[in-house]
């Protein structure tokens, strides 16, 4: 719920099987605290969030499959669906935390002569053609000049390590497959919102609370049964 308004955020869920295992252990193995405490794992829900209009030509959203690729100062690459970028003085498109947008030929750079010809505005003037254009196919054009092609990749979701809910690091051996423009559409001036559903999250919180209370009652009942057994054993 804390990331309800975070663009591109992907929610994290508990394995339902782990919760069922906890309940079964609590019901069937009284007094066995170790077996009643299995590891609880989580997974990321990569379903798309709603598209939100911003009007900023530096905001990009993906429709369909794939991820944007961004790169940090050490050359490590990350995948994200959050297309919120800012323009640096040397012509790079950066994420809020300083990673640079990657194209099919490496990190994208807008030539300085194109930047100096007409400064980029945060928003285009009404009725004017924006100086920076990203086509639905992922072509980056400035002043009508083709600067580069965004790298949009697909990957098996099990090959990603969650970094912060917005960015994901490929695991060693992960295969990143460049997607063709037929598999996605880039929407300029929009951002993909968080896929957190507040109603569903509240329902899950209530369900987890119910399971916790059930487990607590079972443990108390098991403890009471064990105490009675010990008391009876003293008279044998």
Predicted stretch roles:
Residues 2-236:
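Amphipathic alpha-helical polymerization modules
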């Amino acid at each position: 719920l804390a990331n309800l308004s975070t663009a591109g955020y992907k929610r994290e869920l508990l394995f339902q099987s782990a919760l069922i295992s906890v309940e079964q252990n609590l019901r069937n193995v009284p007094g066995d605290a170790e077996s009643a405490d299995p590891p609880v794992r989580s997974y990321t829900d990569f379903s798309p969030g709603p598209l939100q209009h911003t009007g900023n030509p530096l905001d990009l959203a993906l429709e369909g499959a794939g991820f944007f690729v961004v790169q940090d100062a050490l050359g490590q690459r990350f995948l994200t669906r959050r297309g919120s970028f800012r323009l640096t003085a040397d012509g790079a498109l950066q994420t809020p935390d300083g990673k640079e947008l990657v194209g099919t030929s490496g990190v994208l750079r807008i030539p300085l002569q194109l930047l100096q010809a007409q400064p980029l505005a945060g928003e285009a003037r009404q009725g004017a053609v924006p100086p920076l254009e990203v086509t639905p196919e992922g072509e980056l054009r400035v002043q009508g000049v083709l600067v580069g092609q965004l790298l949009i990749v697909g990957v098996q979701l099990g090959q990603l390590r969650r970094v912060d809910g917005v960015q994901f690091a490929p695991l060693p051996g992960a295969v990143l497959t460049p997607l063709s423009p037929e598999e996605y559409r880039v929407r300029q001036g929009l951002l993909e919102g968080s896929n957190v559903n507040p109603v569903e999250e509240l329902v899950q919180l209530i369900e987890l609370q119910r399971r916790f209370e059930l487990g607590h009652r079972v443990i108390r009942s098991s403890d009471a049964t064990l105490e009675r057994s010990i008391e009876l054993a003293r008279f044998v």
